[in-house]
């Protein structure tokens, strides 16, 4: 496993990429409303990314046809935008997208409620986000990868939620997916020892029901096997000798209070 340690210059470029991606997510969130099609979300996302002189990293990646994955309700990840798919009041919508800035990448996902949503749905969104931060606390040089993975999964499972096994986080740099894989559940091994300068995408994918998944006929969309709601929260992070740095959070994002 070749896990790259980034230089200070490379980290700064990833930091800039993350700042841009955070702005894209903020603008997408502000635009979400009932009646939008998921294709409209994709077109806006691509326009925003290119407006910051970045490249949409998802577009064309392994044949993926859009700049953002838009996953609704029981869709966990990789929902393909469509002019036929309309988001409705009460839906929860996960937006997963990434940018390339001067050859360096950032990747982040958010799940939002559309209008008024159920308490069950809001609790799911909250626990998914909180499980990310439970894992982040262990993202320090000298710890092992499984310290992060176990903390994410334990947080969600202790609260009665399903933790998806078939999809995982990853390293990130000049490639969207680099070593190591970062599961959202406790492994039976320690995993690599974390070093300052490593960059990872932590992305809990949590369900109200089973952790088992179905793969869609389109070759991309992944749904919960039991039709239960799913949520997704992701950030690109930097391992340091002290506290980890979240590279894809806006300066005024309320999640910075964690």
Model-predicted segments: where are they?
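Active-site neighborhoods and metal-handling regions in enzymes and metal-associated proteins
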Residues: 1-258
């Amino acid at each position: 496993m070749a896990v790259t340690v980034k230089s200070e210059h490379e980290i700064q470029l990833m930091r800039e990429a993350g700042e841009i991606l955070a702005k894209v997510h903020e603008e997408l969130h502000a635009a979400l409303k009932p009646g939008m099609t998921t294709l409209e979300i994709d077109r806006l996302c691509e326009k925003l990314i290119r407006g910051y002189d970045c490249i949409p990293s998802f577009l064309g990646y392994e044949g993926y046809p859009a700049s953002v994955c838009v996953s609704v309700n029981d869709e966990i990840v990789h929902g393909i935008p469509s002019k036929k798919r309309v988001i409705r009041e009460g839906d929860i919508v996960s937006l997963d997208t990434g940018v390339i800035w001067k050859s360096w990448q950032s990747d982040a996902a958010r799940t939002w409620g559309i209008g008024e949503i159920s308490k069950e749905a809001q609790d799911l969104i909250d626990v998914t986000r909180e499980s990310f931060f439970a894992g982040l606390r262990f993202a320090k040089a000298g710890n092992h990868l499984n310290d992060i993975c176990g903390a994410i999964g334990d947080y969600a499972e202790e609260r009665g939620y399903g933790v998806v096994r078939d999809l995982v986080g990853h390293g990130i740099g000049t490639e969207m997916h680099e070593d190591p894989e970062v599961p959202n559940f406790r492994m039976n091994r320690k995993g690599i020892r974390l070093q300052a300068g490593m960059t990872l995408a932590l992305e809990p994918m949590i369900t109200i029901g089973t952790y088992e998944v179905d793969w869609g006929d389109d070759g991309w969309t992944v749904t919960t096997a039991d039709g239960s709601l799913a949520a997704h929260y992701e950030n690109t992070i930097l391992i340091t000798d002290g506290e980890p740095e979240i590279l894809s959070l806006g300066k005024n994002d309320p999640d910075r209070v964690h």
